[in-house]
From Swiss-Prot:
Belongs to the arsA ATPase family. The keyword Translocase does not apply. Homodimer. This is ATPase get3. Signal peptide: none annotated.
Amino acid sequence: MSSTAIVHDDDLMEPTLQSIVNQKTLRWIFVGGKGGVGKTTTSCSLAIQLAKARKSVLLISTDPAHNLSDAFGQKFGKEARLVDGFTNLSAMEVDPNGSLQDLLANGEGQGDDPMAGLGVGNMMQDLAFSIPGVDEAMSFAEVLKQVKSLSYEVIVFDTAPTGHTLRFLQFPTVLEKALAKLSQLSSQFGPMLNSILGARGGLPGGQNLDELLQKMESLRETIGEVNTQFKNPDMTTFVCVCIAEFLSLYETERMIQELTSYQIDTHAIVVNQLLFPKQGSDCEQCNARRKMQKKYLEQIEELYEDFNVVRMPLLVEEVRGKEKLEKFSDMLINPYVPPN
């Protein structure tokens, strides 16, 4: 007899992110959308809710703008750091334009870290720079280093604007293919390259080509494992964030189609900055904007009838600091009810 719980459609389509918080198997949660729609506020708020239900949560920004520090009022860097006021929520900001030379630097004193020690000299650096999406590679490399050395129960990504996000998600597949090709070339031309490198003093750090390729193969296996997890809906999901306007809705639809093509699960949309004018309000601009928003909300509900669509109000103040983020995060779980 199966032990799988019976989940009713009403539960799946509730206008909250409660189902994501309750899904204990999730390890990777991406939050993304068009620029300026409230991705960082949403990802921080979701991480706060997850911290109530999980042993350890890591929030990672892969957006070059890095708004996590501003949101929490606390400086974060490329090393995971506990968020003030929490014992199980950490945050870090990965620089997607970080120095590729750091990744390709010599490997002295780096231990068994498969990410380290790719000291390959200028020739290999030029080769690495030719790989498509190399900026996103840096984010991914940094993430893998953290995930391998630290065990977090769930990881939330505050991603870059839409296009960058999708390239970042595609990168594991791209890098897998690139490293597989390098391994193939090594098996064909390895002895010849080793003799050339030997005559020139070898690779930085005293490595030979075989050692380098062993490290790259180890990296490829790690990336392959993570890529498999990304395509598993029990382990990975993507939360789309938008506002009720044409361009944002268009970007969301394009993003959902691409995520589907990458086999990445997405079943939740957060619609931010909604106006709820008081009945009898004589604010023409407010009423006109609300009318426009209602039109696009109806389209969202029609297009994504099998999604959890969360409606979030436009607030009077910026959502910054732990206290305001906690209040905002509560509305991701308990639907906002506008005053009469």
